Amino acid sequence: MSKLFWDAQVPWLRLNGSGVRQFLQGQTSADLKALQSGDLLQTCWLTATGRLRAVLELRFDAEGADVVVLAGEASAVHAGFDQVIFPADRVRLQPLGQLRRLQWLEPMAAAMWCIPDAALPEPWASGEAATATALEQWRLQSGFPPGPGELNGETNPLELGLVAQVSTEKGCYLGQETMAKLIGQAGVK
């Protein structure tokens, strides 16, 4: 049997400018300061009260960052970012697009992004795209990504097992006070 992988078209936002890293550092829950150019990192976009709005995957480069929406409403992320970008931020938000995301159905498997119509590179070409049933079984076992009913405006990242996507060390970000309180109490509602 071939190795199974998740093959998905995902919403993609592009941010350009010299202030992109600082902007995303203040808007998302993970610490982005040490993220190297080209590396992928998952993070959460929260409300001011720490409710989960979206799970994002980021990749920085010399000109800015690519943001993939793994769970949540991409149009809400785009509009939310657009509302809080000021000229002093040195950030330009591009229109929404699509990327193709590949990930083996294994614990801690790294993901790869490519253009939507690209031929599968090796070793993906030797694997097998997971069926909807296999993907849902993996999602339920791994707890990732959150399902549509789990992003209901009432849950926080800790309740959905996304503690690795939340930094307790980085300082201020949207929803940070609630996350610090919950992590400090070592509990969820």
Label the predicted regions.
Residues M1-K189:
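Basic, glycine/lysine-rich polyanion-binding surfaces/domains
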